[in-house]
C-alpha cells in the first residue's frame, strides 16, 4: 500500500494477502488512486502456453467447448506438505490459464 500511496503501479506475487479484507483494501486503494495493481501469474508466459495461444489465435485448434486443467508438484517434499498448499500455490495459475484460453467463466460443473 505504501507503493500505491507513493503513486506507483504495483506488480505483486500471489497471494496479495493472507487476509481477504486487507487484499480488498489494496484493490480498492489502487482503483481510488487510478494505479495498476496486478498479480504475477506467470504460467501463461511458458513456452507451451504461448504456442497453444498462437495456435488458438491462428484458428488451428478450433473453438474451445470445454476446459479442464490439472497441476501438480513432483515427488513428495515435506515443505510442500502443508494444509491447502496446492490450493494457494497452484490453483490461481489454473484459473488464470483457463481464463487466458477460454475467457471469463460462464459456468462451472
Question: Which residue stretches match the model-derived regions?
Answer:
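Short loop/edge segments at beta-strand edges and connector loops
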Residues: 12, 39-41, 109
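A contiguous active-site-proximal alpha/beta segment in oxidoreductase catalytic domains
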Residues: 17-80, 87, 94
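Residue-level signal for well-ordered alpha-helical scaffold segments within enzymatic catalytic domains
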Residues: 2, 54, 97-100
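Rossmann-fold NAD(P) dinucleotide-binding segment
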Residues: 1-13
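Residues at helix-coil transition
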Residues: 5, 57, 102-103
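Short, intrinsically disordered, charge-balanced linker/junction segments flanking boundaries
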Residues: 2, 60-61, 107-109
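Rossmann-like dinucleotide-binding domain that binds NAD(P)(H)
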Residues: 77-109
